[in-house]
Amino acid sequence: PPEEPALEAKVPEDSDMRGQWGKRPQETIDRANELLDDFASLLTKRGIRVDRPTPIDFSQPATTPDFHADSQFGCMPPRDVLLTVGSEILEATMSYRCRWFEYLCYRPLMQKYWEEDKNFKHESAPKPRLTDADYHADYLSEKIGVEKRLKWTAEKFFVTTEEEPLFDAADVLRFGKDLVVQHGFTTNLKGIEWIRRHFSDHRVHAVNFPGDPYPIHIDATFTPLRPGLILNNPQRSLPDEQRKMFEKNDWEIIDAAQPAHNSPPPLCYSSTWLSMNVLVLDPKTVCVEKSEVYQAEQMDKLGMEVIPIDLRDAYAFGGGLHCCTADVNREGSCEDYFPNQT
């Protein structure tokens, strides 16, 4: 998509993506679709039902009475849009203008689930207006450097304002009765408060990671593997004060292994830390991108069965193994993993 207030602050100054927008080369699209098809096939063979979205024409502009974006994004990462809590799937507000209509790709599935399951609840958070008031104009990246941005993120001063509730589903982690939500570029405090009021039977905790100059989505920063164990990006450590809830409930937070790559693929929004963007199938089984040998080795040492998945050539379309999936239904009940609250 073209630059917009939320995107300008995410794309590093030296990125190849600067100034580029429009349809990607067809061979890269075909390759990404091939890899996603293979991943879906592997999951299906393991007895997992896999449903796929219905893409719209993302080359169309995204236009509302409040804004105009010359093109849209895509629907590779459903994790960003859909949040499943209990019997409910909630559509996030989204904070990028180019992603405002992305929810439409999942509406056929939402209708299908509603017809299949009388207990299913389909909810949509209030769509934000995304006017200029939603963004700090002085966050334009050509005016600042990484050091200043790190200072701002440490002070919890992000590109998004508190004009209205904003959140992406990929900023939310589910721990049974507790929801952990990252405060950053794509989720503001009003968004976290909206989640808290909406899921009133859950405990909602805000976290932030000062070492990340581009804090967007949590899965390449803080990744639960099984009850009692979490991977944390060593460059984006959870602050000591926010660790107390985990420590009081005997959770171990360990540093993730280093990425196998020194740079992300061409025209990719994400960092090399997609290495820890893994898909946990159950407490003993995890999908890891096949080139991320160090992360796979760490998982093996932690006693997990590692399933290598070829997905790196699809990263540029929206992220890694967790990004390109969204849970609809998992076995089990809602447990209390943090009975000792701070």
Model features per residue range: what roles?
Residues 1-342:
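The feature marks the mature, well-folded catalytic cores of soluble enzymes
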